[in-house]
């Protein structure tokens, strides 16, 4: 019998991803954004961080790569991943009768170097 996800030991990759999300969250809060929700999961996909930036709702994808091979962390967000992020955002926005202005940002870590890309995904 398979253990539920919350009881399974986390892999080194999962722990590194969690640490990256923690670092991204701290950085964004230092820039004045407020955390609304973390790891929003739905049938359509997952959004790492949901932040408020003034009146804008910001969907944040955090990506990590140990090297810049093949274009680095930001380039690893392919068309399929972008579509899943947009679907998850649409599901999240169903909570609002009048959805706020939104944008998709990416926090990319390439060998521990962090880059914040605002409006990285067009929707």
From Swiss-Prot:
Q: What SUPFAM superfamilies does the entry give?
A: Restriction endonuclease-like
Which domain of life does the UniProt lineage start with?
Bacteria
Read off the InterPro entries from this record: Restrct_endonuc-II-like, tRNA_endonuc-like_dom_sf, UPF0102_YraN-like
Q: Which Pfam families does its entry note?
A: UPF0102
Molecular function in Gene Ontology: nucleic acid binding
Q: Which family does the record assign?
A: Belongs to the UPF0102 family.
Stated name of the protein: UPF0102 protein mma_0204
Q: Which organism is it from?
A: Janthinobacterium sp. (strain Marseille)
């Amino acid at each position: 019998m398979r253990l539920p996800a919350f009881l399974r030991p986390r892999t080194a990759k999962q722990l590194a991803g969690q640490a990256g999300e923690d670092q991204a969250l701290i950085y964004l809060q230092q820039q004045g954004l407020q955390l609304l929700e973390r790891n929003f999961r739905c049938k359509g996909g997952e959004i790492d961080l949901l932040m408020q930036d003034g009146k804008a709702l910001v969907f944040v994808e955090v990506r990590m790569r140990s090297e810049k091979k093949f274009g680095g962390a930001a380039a690893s967000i392919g068309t399929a991943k972008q579509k899943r992020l947009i679907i998850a955002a649409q599901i999240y926005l169903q909570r609002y009768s009048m959805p706020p202005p939104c944008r998709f940002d990416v926090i990319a870590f390439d060998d521990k170097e962090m880059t914040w890309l605002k409006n990285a995904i067009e929707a």
